[in-house]
Curated annotation (Swiss-Prot):
Keyword flag Phosphoprotein: yes
Chain positions found as Phosphoserine: 180
Membrane topology: Peripheral membrane protein
Origin species: Mus musculus
Listed name of the protein: Mitochondrial import inner membrane translocase subunit TIM44
Record's subcellular location: Mitochondrion inner membrane
């Protein structure tokens, strides 16, 4: 009963428990670390039970253990430092180290003494040389040598002044000026004919009209007059010229077949055709005018009657550097006033119509030309109104048209189009200045996308 009461936490027989409390508690196997307290405040009996863990250390005991461990470590560290100092002291006091120090000090002292001796010897030698030079300068031979050196210096100075004055006089002579102008002219021709062709394409700083052409300066210094006897033709209006040219182009089967074959020939990427193209171009340049009289020779002869200074190579260079860039840039950028000045009326209407429609819808032209190459004179044709030269060339163009929001409406800024152009340039008989006499009579183009 007592055990049951104890397990329930309350004892129902206080007297009995008090009488045999010690015996009762000792007769039970209690858990390790448990303690029981029986008290009687007043007449009530209270049994208190508490437990403590015997295996868990207290905070103070753990702290003491840590302090002991740190002290043990410090002791080991002190012993290690002491041993290191002892070893260093033994090394410091060793005979080998003492001997090495003595040798180093002796070498250092010898070096200092040697440097001082060399310095002293140099001072003595300098003084001796100075005294010897003073003695030589005071002697007759020394004075003569000194006077000779001074005389040579004066002579050299006078010679330099004389050469300078002679150079100035030579530069003012007419012969020297003529030679200088000739050298400058040759250099300018080389820059224009060689360097200008091999360099990359550059857009003109400002698109110019024919009247603003670079040859306008030439126009001021010369007066051009028409040779009516040599010409033997009557001047006509643009509409009649264009109509005659259009009839010839549309109805002549040989002309159309020729250009169809030439376009395929020029656009071919075949290695053999490209090699043969270079060979045929060279042979044509060398032997083109040695045989029978051709229509091209008649056209060139007619041009020479009007303009005796005309040259085929110079004309092609003019097309590549001025005529083609101005017209082509005006076409892709929508510069209508430039086109109107360079083109005949019918050609201008044909080119201006799509540009005017695009501008009316608010579109913007952002196309650009990357390169112009292979400018060639294909053929010539004598028309009633005057000579017409057919010029072919290739151009690499990026075609881009954007709307008012800046979005790409047509074209692709990342795609390069290789264009093959055929232009018919007619010499304006009303314009006597050869640098502004050529106008665009007709234009034809075909395009292919360039992969590389």
């Amino acid at each position: 009963m007592a055990a049951a009461a104890l397990r329930g936490g309350w004892c129902r027989c206080p007297r009995r428990c008090l009488g045999s409390g010690i015996q009762f508690l000792s007769s039970h196997n209690l858990p390790h670390g448990s303690s029981y307290q029986i008290s009687r405040p007043g007449r009530e009996l209270t049994l208190t039970k508490s437990y403590s863990s015997g295996s868990r250390k207290g905070f103070l005991s753990g702290l003491l253990d840590n302090i002991k461990q740190e002290l043990a470590k410090n002791k080991e560290m002190k012993e290690s430092i002491k041993k290191f100092r002892d070893e260093a002291k033994k090394l410091e006091e060793s005979d080998a180290l003492q001997e090495a120090r003595r040798k180093y000090k002796s070498i250092e002292s010898e070096t200092v003494r040697t440097s001082e001796a060399i310095k002293k010897k140099l001072g003595e030698l300098t003084g001796t040389v100075k005294e010897s030079l003073d003695e030589v300068s005071k002697s007759d031979l020394g004075r003569k040598i000194k006077e000779g050196v001074e005389e040579a210096a004066r002579t050299a100075k006078q010679s330099a002044e004389s050469v300078s004055k002679s150079g100035e006089k030579l530069g003012k002579t007419a012969a020297f000026k003529a030679i200088s102008q000739g050298v400058e002219s040759v250099k300018k021709e080389l820059d224009e004919s060689v360097l200008g062709q091999t360099g990359p394409y550059r857009r003109p700083e400002r698109l110019r009209k024919r009247t603003e052409f670079a040859g306008a300066k030439f126009k001021e210094s010369k007066v051009f007059e028409a040779n009516e006897e040599a010409l033997g033709v009557v001047l006509h209006k643009d509409s009649k010229w264009y109509q005659q040219w259009k009839d010839f182009k549309d109805n002549n089967v040989v002309f159309n077949r020729f250009f169809e074959m030439k376009m395929k020939y020029d656009e071919s990427d075949n290695v053999l055709i490209r090699a043969s193209r270079a060979l045929t171009d060279k042979v044509t340049d060398l032997l083109g005018g040695l045989f029978s009289k051709t229509e091209m020779s008649e056209v060139l002869t007619e041009i020479l009657r009007v303009d005796p200074t005309f040259d085929k190579d110079h004309f092609l260079h003019q097309c590549e550097t001025d005529i083609i860039p101005n017209i082509l840039e005006a076409m892709i950028s929508g510069e209508l006033d430039i086109l109107k000045d360079w083109c005949y009326e019918a050609t201008y209407s044909q080119l201006a119509h799509p540009i005017q429609q695009a501008k009316a819808l608010g579109f913007q032209f952002h196309s650009r030309i990357l390169d112009i190459s292979n400018v060639d004179l294909a053929m010539g044709k004598m028309m009633e109104q005057g000579p017409v030269l057919i010029v072919t060339f290739q151009a690499q163009v990026v075609m881009v048209i954007k709307n008012s929001k800046g979005e790409v409406y047509d074209g692709d800024p990342d795609k390069v189009q290789r264009m093959l152009y055929v232009w018919a340039l007619c010499r304006d008989q009303e314009e006597l200045n050869p640098y502004a006499a050529w106008r665009l009579l007709d234009i034809s183009a075909s395009s292919t996308e360039q992969i590389l």
